[in-house]
């Protein structure tokens, strides 16, 4: 006779693995698109010969600032909106699908200055979509864990993200970038018109789509224990609720508010280093 407890434990383990796989796919895509490959491609190849006194790296910084501002405005209210568990799968599916579609569209960006603006728009939109998708993703942790297991499961997802980024970087480097001359990588793709980089973007998009799909398929089956305590809130209602909660916290413990602001600035600083490290190093 099957043991119901064992079956439930196996199902939970599968859901945790599916949850971690999404992080593996998302972090890998971010490493390729925003840090090491596409951003460098825009500044070192697409933007070469750009008329005017502003360098491609400066335009990249402005695009990143727009993406960061968008995330800063939308992420808190998205967090309020997805407090209802049934909304998390919808938000995660839409934002993940958007990031995949935008990354696929990067295949159209040739190494010509006329394509720089479109490339910057795609880069900023992908960065914003990918970052916002982490909001419903992180909210799902409460549906997968207890207070005693939250740290272990969260760490497993975090580690999976690093493994995914390193693994995809190796795949892209060995298959599409290594070597010199007019053809690169083990696939011997031509560098003319940036074809090797453009093909790499399709691989990065497929990486997120394949690794993110298991979570999207099981997300609607996650426990909805918090649904009753978090009634549905509209977008504008989310801003009102957010302001109410911040005001209440400010009156209760201002040090916590200071900490949240400082941690946000710290994370943004790290994100800027990650985004521009490869660009400045080329």
Model-derived segments and spans:
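Short amphipathic helix-loop junctions that connect adjacent transmembrane helices
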Residues: 31-58, 275-282
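A single, central transmembrane helix in multi-pass transporters
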Residues: 247-282
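C-terminal ends and interior cores of transmembrane alpha-helices
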Residues: 93-114
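Juxtamembrane intracellular "pre-TM" segments in multi-pass secondary transporters
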Residues: 2-17, 220-261
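Glycine-rich segments within core transmembrane alpha-helices of 12-TM secondary carriers
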Residues: 154-180
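Cytoplasmic membrane-interface "Motif A"-like loop-to-helix N-cap segments
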Residues: 82-98
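Central cavity-lining transmembrane alpha-helices of secondary-active solute carriers
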Residues: 37, 57-82, 101-102, 166-169
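Cytoplasmic helix-loop-helix junction between adjacent transmembrane helices
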Residues: 122, 126-160
């Amino acid at each position: 006779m099957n043991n119901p407890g064992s079956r439930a434990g196996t199902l939970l383990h599968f859901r945790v693995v599916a949850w971690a796989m999404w992080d593996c796919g998302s972090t890998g895509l971010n490493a390729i698109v925003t840090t090491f490959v596409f951003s460098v491609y825009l500044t070192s190849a697409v933007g070469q010969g750009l008329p005017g006194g502003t360098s491609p790296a400066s335009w990249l910084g402005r695009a990143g600032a727009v993406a960061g501002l968008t995330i800063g405005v939308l992420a808190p209210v998205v967090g309020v909106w997805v407090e209802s568990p049934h909304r998390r799968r919808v938000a995660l599916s839409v934002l993940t699908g958007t990031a995949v579609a935008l990354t696929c569209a990067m295949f159209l960006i040739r190494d010509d200055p006329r394509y720089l603006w479109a490339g910057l728009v795609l880069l900023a939109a992908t960065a914003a979509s990918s970052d916002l998708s982490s909001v419903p993703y992180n909210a799902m942790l409460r549906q997968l864990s207890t207070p005693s297991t939250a740290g272990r499961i969260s760490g497993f997802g975090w580690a999976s993200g690093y493994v995914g980024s390193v693994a995809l970087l190796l795949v892209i480097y060995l298959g599409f970038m290594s070597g010199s001359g007019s053809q690169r990588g083990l696939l011997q793709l031509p560098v003319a018109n940036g074809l090797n980089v453009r093909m790499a973007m399709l691989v990065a998009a497929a990486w997120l789509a394949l690794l993110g799909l298991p979570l999207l398929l099981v997300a609607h089956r996650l426990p909805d224990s918090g649904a009753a305590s978090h009634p549905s809130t509209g977008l504008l209602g989310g801003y009102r609720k957010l302001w109410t909660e911040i005001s209440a916290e400010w009156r209760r413990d201002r040090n916590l508010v200071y900490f949240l602001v400082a941690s946000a600035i710290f994370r943004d600083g790290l994100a800027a280093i990650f985004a521009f490290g490869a660009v400045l190093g080329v």
